[in-house]
Amino acid sequence: MGKPKGIRAARKLKTHRQAQRWNDKGYKKAHLGTRWKANPFGTASHAKGIVLEKVGVEAKQPNSAIRKCVRVQLIKNGKKITAFVPNDGCLNFIEENDEVLVAGFGRKGHAVGDIPGVRFKIVKVANTSLIALFKGKKERPRS
């Protein structure tokens, strides 16, 4: 069969190309807008939330570790997410019912490294940078 050729074939070629474009994974991702619908943050880069509980997530094979994470309920829409707590001992700065600032974790909405299903990380606790607490530059505010 092949494609139509000739002087009046442009419309047919154009509409066929438009229809076939939707089979391209990258095109579909860019044009459907599901990136914003599926993302708990909506269109934002960061979101505030309340810590529900501390959880340990087992690392994927071949690693053997328990990665320290927290379950967070976002204030803006009530969605519950799991967020990674970076650096050694930083879980000690976080308590239940704390307000935390959560950011993405790298790979554009995908899990990172050996931590399955965790797409976010903690940036601030009680309006204080987690790194500043970790380095000892700031102390946790007393509530």
Curated annotation (Swiss-Prot):
Segments of this protein annotated with the region Disordered: 1-21
One Gene Ontology CC term in the entry: cytosolic small ribosomal subunit
Subcellular location: Cytoplasm, Cytosol; Cytoplasm; Rough endoplasmic reticulum
Composition bias type Basic residues, residue spans: 1-19
GO BP: cytoplasmic translation
Organism domain of life: Eukaryota
Chief location category: cytoplasm
Record-linked CDD domains: Ribosomal_S23
Keyword presence, Ribosomal protein: yes
PANTHER family, per database record: 30S RIBOSOMAL PROTEIN S12 FAMILY MEMBER (PTHR11652)
Sequence similarity: Belongs to the universal ribosomal protein uS12 family.
Subunit structure: Component of the 40S small ribosomal subunit.
NCBIfam families according to UniProt: PRK04211.1, uS12_E_A
The protein, known as: Small ribosomal subunit protein uS12
Species name: Brugia malayi (Filarial nematode worm)
